[in-house]
Amino acid sequence: MLERALNRIMLMVIASRFPETEKPLPLKTEKCHNIGCLYSISGFLMALTAALKAQIAAWYKALQEQIPDFIPRAPQRQMIADVAKTLGGEEGRHLAIEAPTGVGKTLSYLIPGIAIAREEQKTLVVSTANVALQDQIYSKDLPLLKKIIPDLKFTAAFGRGRYVCPRNLTALASTEPTQQDLLAFLDDELTPNNQEEQKRCAKLKGDLDTYKWDGLRDHTDIAIDDDLWRRLSTDKASCLNRNCYYYRECPFFVARREIQEAEVVVANHALVMAAMESEAVLPDPKNLLLVLDEGHHLPDVARDALEMSAEITAPWYRLQLDLFTKLVATCMEQFRPKTIPPLAIPERLNAHCEELYELIASLNNILNLYMPAGQEAEHRFAMGELPDEVLEICQRLAKLTEMLRGLAELFLNDLSEKTGSHDIVRLHRLILQMNRALGMFEAQSKLWRLASLAQSSGAPVTKWATREEREGQLHLWFHCVGIRVSDQLERLLWRSIPHIIVTSATLRSLNSFSRLQEMSGLKEKAGDRFVALDSPFNHCEQGKIVIPRMRVEPSIDNEEQHIAEMAAFFREQVESKKHLGMLVLFASGRAMQRFLDYVTDLRLMLLVQGDQPRYRLVELHRKRVANGERSVLVGLQSFAEGLDLKGDLLSQVHIHKIAFPPIDSPVVITEGEWLKSLNRYPFEVQSLPSASFNLIQQVGRLIRSHGCWGEVVIYDKRLLTKNYGKRLLDALPVFPIEQPEVPEGIVKKKEKTKSPRRRRR
């Protein structure tokens, strides 16, 4: 009787949230790939407990009262319903749900996620792809929810490099030479460059000591340049962990301890992947509810985490092995372990390292034969297939480096257990050195194991060597990365955690989830569901797409003339003074720099990626527009994500061209070879879906709210002249299209410049 009464009350509450013209459909749809399906919150709540029904509906109602001008949206209610059904185990294994801008996806997964986490006594982990969104959820969205859930406990798990190291900060803030000398003995570069830097560090230390600052780089108003932050922070290899005097007050470890008590943990994809691999940091996978926001990044993040690269220059490698043998000898002499590892015996260790060096030297000789002598170069092995001789060397290197990794780990554990009867400074220095050696051999072991594999996740492993010049010296590197990571994601995530939500404003390309399914390993036959929500905006009325009548396509051969025409049309738009806030997006840094050469007289108006950190550029852009000034942000594809500028802040977006993936990337080339071997067309499977995805994100910068308006200018006639152009346009929101004429662009003479070489992927 009680449950029936609660059900009736809940239905009345929820019905009050639906306008009469927006009644939920009585039938439940199993899958929704297209526009139009609508779940009501009441439809799913009937399958959950009365307590959960009451809790979710009450929080949703209270939230509306907290947010000024809150607009109830059917897509948001649908998302709450779908998320709850998945996390509650009522429907499907995992859920991939595309929630366009304006749906309010963050709160749509937090409300049911927190309710179900409490009901099942689990931890809700929300993972993002970048620090900006992670900090927004931690600093804005969760504090908002805490107003309606006063006892909510949440924390953030940022990467170690985002936190200040109190040991390093103390050294850099100190004015006492003895204190600096003591800490500098443990590590290099722990003295301030000048008095101003020392005072800045002293102010940071004061804020940290008085709890005005939590130690996160993004949470202080004090300017910290990258060079100073590199010395203020630390990494795993340079951290003393529990052996550090500052361990209990260290912001990084304080945050890690808070995870054990938190109901909600805000993390990032790389940390989640690492935590699932090592079974550390986060609670047991079976006790997690996981939401992967910006989930379209997951396959790339997983691939980056599994990519291995290492320097293998023979003289450099000899030096590292010599340093390690001396380090082991010092440990044996000064901190002798109770049980001596056989490999630590000098004769055995020297012979082991000598064999390792000879293999590295042989590999150097072989790889150098594939590249022009005495200069920077690169060689990729077709389909990831190594010559037999190289493969045998890699297999042996995997065994030898793994043995050294085990030896370094054994000594590190032994050193960490030593008592205070030893010279603490000398002990800590050895711990740091052994920790770094462990990191090196761990990475090397993974590299050679991956190099020894023919396939990973049913696809080839890309393998290539590079020769790079640094300070006048040539260095040899070896690289490996799998082109598919679905097996790893299945093992670490899909099979380990009962229910996962994968969400983003853009999950589909070309109106299909197929690319996401292929890259991530999510699949309908495993019980995974794929849902695409409606956009709450009226794009037809709020904006339009402008495709200027360019005289040439944006090919490499025509790039100069194309950019000249683009600059001429852009200048015309600026001079019209119709728009205060503008954004210009480029497919390459080369094209962006060439465009800037054509608009030097407008340079003061342009805020260009790389001039300052992105958040500083956006702050300045906001200030300019607020003061009635015109302002133009100029950047690459990264500026097409996470940029939320509403109204006059951004009313015109300029897109240089369709952003197909780079054709010179070793990974892209190997994937193309593999697809051809399977009689699949790389352009259809690889290039076009990627281009569609990029274009959707770029166009999505314009309409961010019901009050937004403006134009998206795309300088690429192929959208109208090529067969695939229609498919790309069909995947975009429905805008009216205009085709204005373009002023003739005067091609400038191109200055010859040597572009710096970078390692390609």
Please state what every model-predicted region is.
Residues 47-64, 71, 120-123, 128-263, ...:
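A substrate-engagement module of RecA-like helicase motors
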Residues 48-97:
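Conserved pre-motif I regulatory segment
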Residues 109, 115, 135, 140-143, ...:
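Signature of the SF2 helicase/ATPase Hel1-core->accessory helical subdomain module
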Residues 123-130, 501-505, 580-587, 714-715:
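Conserved RecA-like ASCE P-loop NTPase motor core of nucleic-acid helicases/translocases
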Residues 230-263, 273-282, 411-543, 548-551, ...:
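A contiguous, basic/glycine-rich beta-loop/short-helix subdomain that forms a polymer-engagement track
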Residues 548-558, 611-720:
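Conserved RecA-like P-loop NTPase helicase motor core
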Residues 551-587:
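Conserved interdomain hinge at the start of the Helicase C-terminal
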Residues 587-610:
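Conserved helicase motor "Helicase C" RecA-like lobe of SF1/SF2 P-loop NTPases
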